[in-house]
Structures are given as C-alpha cells and as structure tokens.
C-alpha cells in the first residue's frame, strides 16, 4: 500500500470517528478511539507525522479545530455529501446527563439543588496569595507613570509598552483583579465617566525629567558666554569703567572662564548621577521605598565589616521592631532583594573559606577617590582650577572613557598628501596633465583576494561512521546501485548545513560582497574550493571538477554529490567560516547485490531510484571500501519494512552476492581527489586596480626613476613593474589593442596633425594585415616604453625611446595577398607543468595567471598614427599608411574618428 492510499484511508476513518461524536473529540480521545475501533494504532510515523495535531494540519478538508474555555483543543469533523444523513442523526441525540442523587431524608429535610456550572480547571496553589514580583511592579510603575490607564485598556497598553502580553497566570494569579489587589500598596482604582481608571498612589518622577536635565545641561553649558558678557551692558553704557574692572585685583584673581569650565564638568557628573538614579528607579530597585533603603543602610552601617546575609533579617527586626518585607516588595529571597539594591548595598564574599558565606556591606563607589596632594586646590589662583577640574573628571564616566579608535584622526597622511600636492604643482606640465588624463587607471599592490577566502585549502572529508550503525539518510544522486551519494539527515551536521546555506544566501546576495568574492581566472583550476548559485537563489559549496571551456566549468557539489556545468563568472570565493563543516555527500554502494550482467541496466537504475529517492531511509553501515560506504538501505515509511537490496532481487534486477562486492577502483572518488588536510599549489595573486596618486610620481622623480606605473608581473622575484607611458594631454584616446610592428622611433610630434588621418583613407592595400594585427595571438607581445621626465626648463620636449620588440613583423606578413596569419612559435607543454612564457624577453609569466593592464599601452603602430612618423627601417613602409575601409576599424577607433568617417566614399 502506498502512502497516498494509506493517507486516504486514514482520512476516511478519522471523519467517521468525528462525525459520530456530537461534541467532538480531543486529540488523545481520537487516538484511543481509533485504536479501539480498528485494532491498531494510527499510522502517524509511517506518514511522517509526529503527533495527531501534525496529522490534522494535513487534513483541512476533514477536521477543524475549536478551543474550549479551559484551553483544550476539540477536533470536529467537516462533513461532505456522504455524511449528511449521519450528521442529522447525531445532532438529534440527547446529551448524557448524570443521574441525580435522590436521598430520602427524614421529615423536615429539604433538598435544595443549585445549577452546577462546569468549573474551569486552573493550576492550584496554597492558601496564601502570591506577592507581586519585583520586575512586574517596576513595569506597572513605568506604565502608570505616563498617566491614568483605564482598566479595560491595561492589557493592550502593556503589550504596546513592553512588547509581550500580560499573562498573570504565570505569576500565580487567577485574574487581573487578583493581581491588582496584590498591588494596592502603590496602585489605586478610581471611578470616572469612562469607567475604572488605574493610577499610582504616590507621585512619581515625570518621564520627561531626562529631557529637563538635558535642557538644563545645555543652558549651563552655554552659560559661560552669557556670564562673561554680563558686564557688556555696563561696558556699553559706561565705557570709562572698563579700566577699573580690568585693574580690580578681585576680578583678576577669580577669572570667570575657569570657573565656568569647572561647572561644565560638575554638570556632566551631576547629569550622569541623575541618569543613573533614573535607570535604577526604572528597574527592580525602584520597587523598594527610600525609607526601607535607609533602614537597611543603617543596619549594615552598624557593622563596620559588613553583616552576614543570613543575619540581615534578624538584625533588621531587632533594630526596627518589624520583619523585613521581602515578599511584600516582590522578592523571593533576601539575596535577590540585596542584589536589586545595587545603589545602596553590595554583596561580597566572606573572609572565611566557605563559599556559601556572603557579606552585605554598604555600597561605596570606587571612582570617588581622593585626589593627589599636588593636585589639591590651594590658595593660589594657579593650582585651584587644576585641582577642581581633576576631581569631577575622575568621577564622571564621560571624561574617564578612553578615546575611541573611530575618533582618532591621523594627521600624518594628510600632511604628506598636502606636501605631495604642493610638489605636484611645482612639477612639470606633462606629469600634471597625465594625472588628470588617467585618474583611475593604475594598479595597486594590494591583493584582490579577500583575507577570509579559501584559496588553496581543501575541505574536510565526510565523517566516518561506525560499523553496524543505523542512521537516517537521504539518497541524493544515483548513478547505479553500486554508485550513488547519500547525505545523513536529522543530525547536528544536517542542521548546521541548513543554517550555513541560509547564512551564505544572506551574505552573497549583496552585490558588493558578490563582486568582492568573485573568483579570478587564476584560481579557476581543478580542485579549487568555491561556491556558486545555479539559479541565483541558494549558494552551494562546490569544487571545480573540470575547466570545460573559457566560459563554463564543471563543478562537484560537495554536499549533494551532483556534477553540473555552471558559468565561469558565477563562481565565488568560499569564506573560511563556511569551510569548517565537513563535506556532507558520501559516496556509497549498496551491499549484498550485484548486477546480473556486467553493468546495471536502465530498468534496475530506475527501480532503485523509485525505491530510494525523495524519502528518508534507514541505513545500516557495513564497512568502508576505499572511502566508499557499503551499506544496506531499509524503507520504514510503509506498513512493512522494505529492504532495497531484497526488493531489487525480487524484481529480477540484481542477484545476491557477498556484501563487499564492488569495483571501486573504476569509479570517481571525490574523497581522495578533492578532500583532505593538504593544500593545492599557491597561485601568484593578481593585483586590484586603484587610483595612482601623485605621490608615487613625485617619489619616482626624487629617486631618478621614470615617472611611470608598472604592470608587468615578475614570476621570479614577485615584484611588479609597469611600462612607462606618456600621452599628449590634448588627445582623448580610446582604449586600443596592441599589435606587433617593426621598431619605429618617433622624433617629434605635431599638435596640428589629425591623428586619424590615415584611418579614414580608402586605399585598399592593408586589409588582411590589419586583421592579423588585431588578432588575440598578438596581445601578449606588448611593447615596453621608458619615459624620461624632467622639468620644462631642462627638457622642453618629451622623447619616446622604445625598446626592441620580441619579434619583428616580416615582409611576408605585410603582403596584400590573403595568407595564413603567422602564429607565435610556442611549444605545446603539459598544463600540469607550467613553463614561463617570455613577454618582451624580460618578464616571464606563468600561463593562466592574468596580467591586468593599467591603461591601453601605445604600440609602435599607434605612435606612427598619433605623430609624425620617422621610419628607420630598410625601404619604404607603405603598409601602415593605407586602410581598405573604415568598417574594418574597431568600434573604439571608429568612435574616435568622429564625423570624418561619414565623408568616406
């Protein structure tokens, strides 16, 4: 019987039981009636339900829930067309009434009967009424301090104030009226035209007192200017009195600004004290009156070394002739009461060795310490302000706090940048204009990989289980009964996986975080740990299985066992905190069976998937064979347990064999390939772009080095060098690519020459050569230029000195006939053994490591286009002076040519 058939039969039986009950059944009664009528318990576990209420949630068309006055749940049936007649008969049934107890008494005995109501069952307690807890007293005081509250609005106002319902039963009260009767010492009830109102018995400090304190504090903080200007009316009306005031010795000995500065710190200290008192009054300490606090302080003060907490009630009764009102104030013990009075009393450990001996002492703030003698106020005018300023500062928390790191301002970098700006203004015109021309196209020496990213580490392998252990598992990916992946469920690791996926989704969903953790091309390699979101929703931990193409890679899902293709740009670095959890997908084999032939047929695989997938199974661990888990699978969701290996044998898809049968060596094993505690090979980190500051150029001038930014990577020393480039500031150049051209030296430049004059010509001579020059093979042959920059007084012109390129373009490549483009001579090597590729014969770069260009370098060809060419090669070089059509240009060149390209014919 399938689960759907079992659930349909259960719905029919439950409806029949509930329809026959006129007033419904409780969940427990329904369970007992089901077992007594059918003879077996309800199949809750077989259908995946934990209790009857979980089953009811899945049957909204059969059962409805009702709540009684005492909070019990009653289940009633929802009838259909087949149960209308039975419902009418059940509704006409008479309710069962208990027989009255008719006692025959003596003559004159009258039996008086009263209507009996069903009592509400509530938790019972002793005879004494409970005391109001201290925190509830404090909350009620805060609620009523805003003003009177109507009795009908007490619960709603309490929820709005504190964010939780007023549940008086958890404090031992039967009703709100009983709770209010216990709070009659500070709450009174008055009748008004709108109904009963609750208000405080005694006056309470208004809630806007802190605002008054802040207003008074602001007035006092601004008072020095007003007091200093107090003499201004007299001074304005009587200007001749100014010398008298300045010559008066009494006014000179007591300057007003120092006095007002002292009052500022005193005001801060008083403000903190008043705020602290307000906080204490809002807490549990506010439930104790000041009179009781003073009495307790006197009892403790009589004993210089403190009094034992066990003797405090006795001493209090001996001194004041009354018992200590602990329960009346809402406290359960003397220790709780003394702990709440932190502004008056303190608890310390006793001097003896007993740990349970506590002493109650009078509270003395630690901060109020006497000042040092040299800082104490004296008779002179110099020492008096210092001593008066130190004492409030030592007591006030505002002045004792250390300076925060966020408030610390570093002035040295600002000074350096200001000096650099000053030096830049004195520098020559070329450097100043280069900074403005390329403001954000330089390279930083800071790593582009986040510090908490998993770079070369491997994930932890799945946890090994003990033999003969029974575990709940989920079959995730199936290839055959001899090769599939399982994942353990209903354990701590499964819950950790769910929480981790939720955290990963919330983390990587931010665009800035996703862009920062984007996986560079250098790290796209087999075995690299990363994460990916296939449908842009949930992120999964993956390991790169194979680099399929330039845009796609195959990844292995370490927690689910799938291998799929994903886009290369969707890969992200995995944060280190998400690598602590071991891989959850375990490669497994079904023990005890083998295929009838050498391979498993498609019918056997589909049967195995039907028996295992989309349900929780019980796995019996047999053993491990080369990190493959050999196990038995059992389906306990049906009435009878179904063993998967026996079901395959019965249906004729397999034959029995020894439990250890399997060809593990021929299968892909991710545990040995991708997991472990070793690491992959280190990758030369690429550099992230940043704005080249003028400081770097000024420093390079001071060191007699070219003012340039270096972008070629050195694999041996790890340093970074960039080719120096100088650009005419009057040109707005588009980003152009690099091609191989012969050595050309530019001797002079003319500002009046159109830089794209050669591009707009229509002479059809250089069609194939143009296409060959812009191919992707020539992108690595970049030209290195060095720029000697000096002041305008020493060198009025800037001269390019290009270094020789790696390979010059021959005449055969420049012919007009369509020939095969010449590919750079490279040797095919094993990708696992990287060989340095020479770029410009001086910068070896490993294959696969990207070199990020700073800005488009200017090739010899572009230098010839941008200036007056002086060709030094053997013979005329006419190939670079003609172009077949403007449509052969790249989009950037066509945009730079502007409107002149429209006049070509």
Curated annotation (Swiss-Prot):
Biased amino acid composition, Polar residues: 379-393, 700-723
Domain (Tudor): residue spans on this chain: 523-581
Region (Disordered): 219-264, 368-393, 694-728
Subcellular location per the Swiss-Prot or TrEMBL entry: Cytoplasm
Record-annotated HTH OST-type domain positions: 6-79, 128-204, 288-364
Keyword Zinc-finger belongs to the record: no
Keyword set, alphabetical order: Cytoplasm, Developmental protein, Differentiation, Repeat, Spermatogenesis
GO CC annotations, alphabetized: chromatoid body; pi-body
Source superkingdom: Eukaryota
Principal subcellular localisation of the protein: cytoplasm
InterPro entries: LOTUS-like, OST-HTH/LOTUS_dom, SNase_OB-fold_sf, TDRD5_LOTUS_2, Tudor, Tudor_domain_containing
Tagged with keyword Repeat: yes
Single GO biological process annotation from the record: P granule organization
Cited function: Required during spermiogenesis to participate in the repression transposable elements and prevent their mobilization, which is essential for the germline integrity. Probably acts via the piRNA metabolic process, which mediates the repression of transposable elements during meiosis by forming complexes composed of piRNAs and Piwi proteins and govern the methylation and subsequent repression of transposons.
Family stated for the protein in its record: Belongs to the TDRD5 family.
Name of the protein described by the UniProt record: Tudor domain-containing protein 5
Organism: Danio rerio
């Amino acid at each position: 019987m399938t689960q759907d058939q079992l659930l349909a039969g259960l719905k029919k039986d439950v409806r029949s039981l509930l329809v026959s009950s006129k007033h419904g059944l409780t969940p427990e009664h329904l369970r007992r009636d089901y077992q007594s009528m059918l003879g077996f318990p309800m199949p809750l576990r077989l259908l995946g339900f934990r209790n009857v209420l979980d089953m009811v949630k899945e049957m909204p068309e059969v059962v409805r829930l009702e709540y009684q006055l005492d909070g019990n749940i009653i289940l009633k049936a929802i009838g259909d067309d087949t149960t209308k007649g039975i419902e009418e008969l059940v509704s006409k049934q008479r309710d069962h009434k208990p027989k009255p107890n008719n006692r025959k008494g003596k003559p004159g005995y009258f039996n008086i009967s009263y209507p009996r109501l069903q009592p509400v069952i509530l938790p019972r307690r002793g005879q004494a009424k409970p005391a109001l807890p201290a925190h509830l007293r404090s909350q009620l005081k805060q609620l009523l301090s805003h003003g009177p509250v109507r009795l009908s609005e007490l619960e709603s106002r309490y929820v709005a104030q504190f964010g939780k319902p007023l549940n008086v039963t958890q404090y031992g009260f039967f009703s709100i009226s009983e709770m209010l009767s216990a709070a009659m010492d500070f709450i009174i009830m008055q009748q008004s035209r709108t109904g009963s109102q609750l208000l405080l018995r005694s006056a309470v400090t208004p809630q806007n007192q802190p605002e008054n304190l802040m207003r008074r504090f602001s007035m006092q903080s601004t008072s020095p200017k007003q007091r200093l200007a107090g003499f201004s009316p007299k001074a304005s009306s009587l200007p001749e009195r100014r010398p008298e005031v300045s010559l008066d010795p009494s006014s000179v000995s007591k300057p007003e600004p120092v006095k007002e500065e002292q009052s500022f710190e005193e005001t801060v200290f008083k403000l903190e004290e008043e705020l602290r008192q307000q906080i204490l009054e809002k807490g549990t300490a506010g439930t104790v009156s000041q009179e009781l606090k003073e009495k307790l302080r006197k009892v403790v003060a009589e004993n210089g070394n403190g009094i034992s907490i066990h003797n405090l009630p006795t001493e209090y009764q001996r001194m004041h002739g009354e018992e200590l009102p602990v329960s009346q104030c809402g406290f359960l013990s003397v220790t709780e009461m003394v702990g709440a009075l932190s502004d008056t009393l303190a608890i310390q450990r006793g001097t003896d060795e007993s740990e349970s001996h506590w002493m109650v002492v009078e509270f003395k703030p630690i901060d109020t310490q006497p000042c040092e003698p040299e800082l104490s106020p004296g008779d002179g005018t110099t020492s008096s302000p210092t001593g008066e300023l130190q004492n409030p500062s030592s007591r006030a928390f505002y002045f004792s706090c250390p300076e925060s790191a966020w408030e610390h301002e570093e002035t040295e970098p600002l000074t350096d940048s200001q000096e650099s700006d000053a030096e830049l203004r004195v520098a020559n015109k070329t450097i100043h204009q280069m900074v403005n021309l390329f403001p954000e196209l330089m390279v930083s020496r800071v790593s582009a990989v986040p510090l908490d990213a998993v770079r070369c580490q491997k994930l932890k392998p799945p946890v090994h289980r003990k033999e003969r252990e029974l575990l709940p598992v989920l079959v995730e990916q199936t290839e055959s009964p001899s090769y599939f992946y399982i994942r353990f469920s209903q354990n701590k690791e499964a819950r950790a996986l769910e929480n981790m996926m939720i955290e990963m989704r919330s983390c990587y969903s931010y665009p800035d975080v996703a862009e920062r953790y984007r996986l560079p091309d250098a790290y796209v390699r087999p075995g690299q740990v990363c994460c990916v979101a296939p449908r842009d929703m949930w992120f999964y931990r993956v390991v790169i299985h194979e680099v399929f193409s330039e845009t796609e890679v195959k990844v292995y899902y370490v927690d689910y066992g799938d291998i799929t293709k994903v886009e290369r740009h969707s890969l992200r670095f995995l944060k280190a905190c998400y690598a602590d959890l071991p891989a959850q997908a375990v490669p497994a084999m079904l023990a005890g069976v083998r295929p009838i032939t050498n391979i498993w047929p498609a019918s056997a695989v589909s049967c195995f998937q039907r028996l295992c997938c989309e349900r929780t199974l019980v796995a019996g661990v047999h053993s491990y064979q080369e990190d493959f888990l050999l196990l038995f699978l059992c389906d306990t969701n049906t009435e009878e347990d179904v063993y998967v290996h026996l079901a395959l044998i019965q249906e004729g898809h397999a034959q029995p064999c020894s439990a250890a049968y399997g060809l593990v060596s021929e299968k892909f094993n991710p545990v040995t390939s991708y997991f472990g505690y070793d690491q992959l090979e280190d990758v030369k980190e690429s550099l992230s772009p940043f704005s080249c500051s003028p400081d770097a150029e000024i420093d390079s001038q001071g060191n007699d080095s070219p003012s340039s930014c270096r972008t070629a990577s050195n694999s041996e020393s790890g340093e970074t060098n960039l080719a120096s480039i100088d650009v005419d500031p009057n040109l707005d150049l588009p980003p152009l690519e690099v091609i191989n051209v012969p050595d050309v030296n530019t001797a002079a430049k003319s500002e009046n020459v159109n830089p794209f004059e050669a591009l707009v010509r229509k002479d059809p001579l250089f069609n194939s050569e143009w296409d060959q020059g812009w191919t992707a093979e020539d992108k690595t042959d970049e030209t290195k230029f060095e720029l000697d920059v000096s002041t305008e007084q020493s060198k009025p012109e800037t001269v390019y000195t290009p270094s020789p390129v790696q390979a010059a373009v021959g005449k055969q490549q420049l012919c007009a006939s369509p020939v095969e483009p010449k590919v750079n001579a490279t040797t095919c090597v094993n990708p696992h053994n990287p060989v340095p590729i020479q770029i410009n014969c001086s910068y070896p770069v490993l294959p696969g490591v990207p070199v990020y260009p700073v800005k488009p370098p200017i090739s010899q060809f572009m230098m010839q286009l941008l200036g007056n060419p002086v060709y030094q090669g053997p013979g005329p070089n006419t190939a670079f002076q003609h172009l077949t059509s403007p449509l052969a240009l790249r989009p950037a060149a066509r945009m730079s040519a502007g409107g002149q390209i429209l006049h070509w014919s």
